[in-house]
Amino acid sequence: MERRRRPTLEMVAALAGVGRGTVSRVINGSDQVSPATREAVKRAIKELGYVPNRAARTLVTRRTDTVALVVSENNQKLFAEPFYAGIVLGVGVALSERGFQFVLATGRSGIEHERLGGYLAGQHVDGVLLLSLHRDDPLPQMLDEAGVPYVYGGRPLGVPEEQVSYVDIDNIGGGRQATQRLIETGHRRIATIAGPQDMVAGVERLQGYREALLAAGMEYDETLVSYGDFTYDSGVAAMRELLDRAPDVDAVFAASDLMGLAALRVLRASGRRVPEDVAVVGYDDSTVAEHAEPPMTSVNQPTELMGREMARLLVDRITGETTEPVRLVLETHLMVRESG
């Protein structure tokens, strides 16, 4: 049997009735092609089963058409927290639409950061999406020194905003919404399980809690503030600490749904009813909140949209469509359920 000849760029051009250069521009995502011509080329590619030679394309474009999504946490936290699933989904969809793929990497220790920095600076990827950064993360400096473009997921702490691109959630507004809900439902001893204070989400959700209390003429009481790291186990410890310090607490705003779920279970174990004795509001509006017992009121943050926008900004930087830093802040809203 005669072996079928592998389709070539020239065969695609002939079938589409265009030049070889036009086919290259379509494959490389150039906007210098009319919609009708682009569709003709795509039809020819599909009909012939043409697969671009990625190695040859990389030599010409000096691009890999690959980006890295780097989560500055350990693997256990990445797969335990529902926040990351929405981000990964949004990133994947947006990159696929632009002809890019991505690799997922994690790292929190110094050794992991050093390894990651070497990989990211080694021309394996065209750009980097940075997620869940802490104040001391060295990766942005490594990328700057290597000339690799990147976009933050979340406003970075300690960095002049005008110098960087990021997509963030309105964490202050979300913290304010959660606390206002508890105030409006008649609660007066409102505690919070805040997130880590070396991350912008932890800092700003606590700020929103404080602002809501002060706006209502209520005192900000440090004894009603405990801290976790967004995980379930940290929420258990924080809720127990709050009950030891303030047994008369009548409401809790938890800065993540996992910490909110932990609060629900600790309260139940202590003999307190939710929401009759203590109301609870979480943050994420994840399936954790939806299936909690009772179902948990929670702040909805558009994580899939956040992932999409992060990917869009980065690809625009890689392709030269934008050169200036871009900053986006996405709105939150409250999903009211039975817990508060």
Curated annotation (Swiss-Prot):
Residues 9-28 bind DNA. Its main location: cytoplasm. GO terms for molecular function: DNA-binding transcription factor activity; transcription cis-regulatory region binding. Keywords: Cytoplasm, DNA-binding, Repressor, Transcription, Transcription regulation. Residues 1-61 form the HTH lacI-type domain. InterPro entries: HTH_LacI (IPR000843), LacI/GalR-like_sensor (IPR046335), Lambda_DNA-bd_dom_sf (IPR010982), Peripla_BP_I (IPR028082). Induction: Constitutively expressed. The keyword Cytoplasm applies. The keyword Cell membrane does not apply. Pfam families: LacI, Peripla_BP_3. SUPFAM superfamilies: lambda repressor-like DNA-binding domains, Periplasmic binding protein-like I. It is found in: Cytoplasm. Transcriptional regulator that regulates the expression of all six cellulases, encoded by the cel genes (designated celA through celF). Acts as a repressor. Specifically binds to a 14-bp inverted repeat site, which is present in the upstream region of the cellulase genes. This is HTH-type transcriptional regulator CelR.
